[in-house]
C-alpha cells in the first residue's frame, strides 16, 4: 500500500541538560547573492526597460512574456545578457568581480565537484552556466510585480488555545500578513483570510501525522481553498520533531504547532511560511538561509536583522505553480500545464541531486502526471 505523502517542517529543540493557454507569461527569478545593493535594468522584449534594485540577499521574480535581457555594470564594464524564461539567476561577485550566473536546472543534473561549503547556498551546490558578455531612479524590485494571485484561507485554532478569540485572531492575521509581504514580493501570491473557526482536537493523539489526519477529517476548508490549523495540543519534547506539516503541493490542509514558548514569533512565521511554500510547490533546499531548509527552529531566526527569504530555485517553482493557478482553475499538480510540469521536473531533479538524503523533491516529482515515472 502506498504511504500518504506528508511533508513536515522539522524543528530541533535542545534541552537544558542535553495544459494551458497558448500564450502565457513566464517567470525569471533574479537573486542578489552579494553583500551590497545592485541596480540593474530588466527589459521584457520590446517593452520599456525597468530600473530595479536588490539589496544584498534579496531576490525578485519577474514576468516574462517575450525575450528578456538584463543590463548591469559588471566586472568588465556595462553588460547586457539575454535571459532564459522560467529560469533562475544569481548576481555573484567572486574575487570582487560582479557577474550574473544562471542556476543550471536539469532533470539530468550532476552535483558540482566542489562542494561541502561551510554555508551552502544554491549557486554553489548547483552547476552554473558561464557568463557571456554583452547593452531613472532605481525602484525596489517588488514594484515590478503585477497580477497578484489571491488564495482564500480559513484559519483555525483547536480547543487547547489559551488566548481569547480576539487575541488569537489578531495574532494569526498579523502573522499571515507578514508572510504575505514576502510571498507577494517574491512570487506574486497572497493568502487572504476569509473565515476563522475552531475545532476540538483529541487529547489522546500525540503523533503529528495522526493529528493531521484528524484535522483533515474534522475540518472542511470551505468557504476557503486552504485550511490552516494551529494546534496547542502537545508537551514540549527534546530533540527533533515535527512543527508543521501538509500532505503535499496544493493540499487542502496545513497543520502547525502553536504551543511552545521556546519558539519565537519569527520562528513561528518561518514554520508557517515553510508549509505554505510546500503548498505552492516549494521543496526542501540546501540553502542555509532559505525558509525551505529542512530543519527550522535552529535559532537562526533569532539573530538580529535576520530576514526570512526563499531560495531562488524554490521561488521559481512557486512562481511557475502560481502562474498556472492564476491562468487556469488548477487544484492539483496533475492539472498543471505540461510545460510547467516538465520544468518542475527539472527543478525537483536538481534539488534531489543537491539533497540526496531528503525525499521531498522526489516525492513532489512523482506527483507530476505529465512526467514519465521510473
For every predicted segment, state its role.
Residues 22-67, 73-131, 135, 143-144:
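Intrinsically disordered, low-complexity segments enriched in small/polar residues
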Residues 276-291:
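Catalytic Zn2+-binding segment of zinc metalloproteases
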Residues 233-251:
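Catalytic zinc-binding patch centered on the HExxH motif and its immediate surroundings
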Residues 253-273:
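Short pre-active-site segment immediately N-terminal to the catalytic Zn-binding motif
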Residues 1-9:
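Bacterial N-terminal signal peptides that target proteins for export
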Residues 114-226, 230-235, 333, 337-374:
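Propeptide-to-catalytic entry region of secreted or membrane-anchored zinc metalloproteases
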Residues 291-322:
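Post-HExxH zinc-binding segment in Zn-dependent metallohydrolases
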Residues 14-22:
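C-terminal segment of classical bacterial N-terminal signal peptides
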Amino acid at each position: 500500500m502506498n504511504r500518504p505523502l506528508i511533508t513536515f517542517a522539522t524543528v530541533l529543540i535542545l534541552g537544558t541538560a542535553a495544459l494551458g493557454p497558448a500564450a502565457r507569461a513566464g517567470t525569471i527569478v533574479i537573486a542578489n547573492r552579494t553583500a551590497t545593493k545592485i541596480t540593474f535594468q530588466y527589459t521584457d522584449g520590446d517593452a520599456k526597460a525597468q530600473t530595479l534594485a536588490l539589496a544584498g540577499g534579496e531576490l525578485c521574480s519577474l514576468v516574462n512574456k517575450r525575450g528578456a535581457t538584463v543590463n548591469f555594470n559588471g566586472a568588465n564594464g556595462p553588460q547586457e545578457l539575454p535571459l532564459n524564461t522560467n529560469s533562475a539567476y544569481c548576481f555573484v561577485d567572486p574575487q570582487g568581480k560582479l557577474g550574473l550566473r544562471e542556476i543550471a536546472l536539469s532533470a539530468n543534473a550532476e552535483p558540482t565537484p566542489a562542494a561541502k561549503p561551510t554555508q551552502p547556498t544554491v549557486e554553489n551546490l548547483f552547476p552554473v552556466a558561464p557568463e557571456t558578455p554583452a547593452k531613472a531612479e532605481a525602484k525596489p524590485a517588488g514594484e515590478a510585480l503585477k497580477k497578484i494571485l489571491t488564495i482564500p484561507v480559513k484559519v483555525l485554532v483547536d480547543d487547547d488555545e489559551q488566548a481569547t478569540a480576539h487575541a488569537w485572531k489578531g495574532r494569526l492575521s498579523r502573522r499571515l500578513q507578514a508572510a504575505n509581504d514576502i510571498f507577494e514580493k517574491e512570487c506574486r501570491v497572497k493568502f487572504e483570510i476569509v473565515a476563522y473557526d475552531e475545532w476540538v482536537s483529541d487529547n489522546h493523539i500525540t503523533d503529528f501525522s495522526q493529528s493531521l489526519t484528524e484535522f483533515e477529517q474534522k475540518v472542511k476548508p470551505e468557504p476557503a481553498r486552504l485550511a490552516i490549523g494551529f494546534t496547542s495540543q502537545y508537551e514540549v519534547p527534546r530533540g527533533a520533531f515535527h512543527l508543521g506539516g501538509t500532505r503535499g503541493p496544493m493540499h487542502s490542509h496545513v497543520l502547525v504547532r502553536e504551543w511552545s514558548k521556546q519558539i519565537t514569533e519569527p520562528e513561528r512565521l518561518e514554520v508557517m511560511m515553510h508549509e505554505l511554500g510546500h503548498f505552492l510547490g516549494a521543496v526542501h533546499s540546501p540553502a542555509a538561509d532559505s525558509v525551505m531548509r529542512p530543519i527550522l527552529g535552529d535559532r537562526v531566526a533569532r539573530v538580529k536583522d535576520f530576514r526570512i527569504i526563499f531560495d531562488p530555485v524554490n521561488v521559481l517553482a512557486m512562481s511557475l505553480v502560481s502562474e498556472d493557478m492564476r491562468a487556469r482553475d488548477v487544484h492539483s499538480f496533475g492539472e498543471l500545464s505540461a510545460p510547467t510540469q516538465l520544468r518542475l521536473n527539472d527543478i525537483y531533479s536538481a534539488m534531489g541531486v543537491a539533497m540526496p538524503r531528503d525525499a521531498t523533491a522526489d516525492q513532489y516529482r512523482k506527483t507530476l502526471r505529465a512526467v514519465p515515472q521510473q
